[in-house]
Amino acid sequence: MSTVPVKIKPLDHYEGLALPAYETPQSAGMDLRAAVPADEPVSIPPGEWRLIPVGIAIALPAGFEAQVRPRSGLAAKHGISCVNTPGTVDADYRGEIRVNLINHGQANFVVNRGDRIAQMIIAPVTQAVWEIADTLDETTRGTGGFGSTGTK
């Protein structure tokens, strides 16, 4: 496992919250906390989504991205996920990170200040250099997609 230094800027509305942290020594992701006002929890009715601020901005080194992903416990227990998963935070983005949560569950879900709402993974980036081709290598799969390899 490797590490990379990442600058983090807690924003004014992040005051009093713990910085994102790895919960175990082998964790790939660190939890992001909701930076909503304590007196204004955010309600997410079934089938709807809300953009939740996390109160931090980061400066990733060139060649890295941050991926924002759902927390498995919220998905399993409440049907809460991220609308665009994984969400990508590019190395040159300097604004506040926000999480677009969606409620796939049957009950209203309330996000309170400090709730752990998503996880963030720091990952290396590989950029493609396109090579125009008239043909592509043949494979066993060919053009089969969307279930073409079966379900069992």
Curated annotation (Swiss-Prot):
GO molecular function terms attached to this record: dUTP diphosphatase activity; magnesium ion binding
Catalysed conversion reaction: dUTP + H2O = dUMP + diphosphate + H(+)
Catalytic activity, EC: 3.6.1.23
Cross-referenced InterPro entries: dUTPase, dUTPase-like, dUTPase-like_sf, dUTPase_trimeric
Binding locations of substrate: R71, S72, G73, N84, T88, V89, D90
Functional note: This enzyme is involved in nucleotide metabolism: it produces dUMP, the immediate precursor of thymidine nucleotides and it decreases the intracellular concentration of dUTP so that uracil cannot be incorporated into DNA.
Family matches, as HAMAP family: dUTPase_bact
Name under which the protein is recorded: Deoxyuridine 5'-triphosphate nucleotidohydrolase
Primary gene name: dut
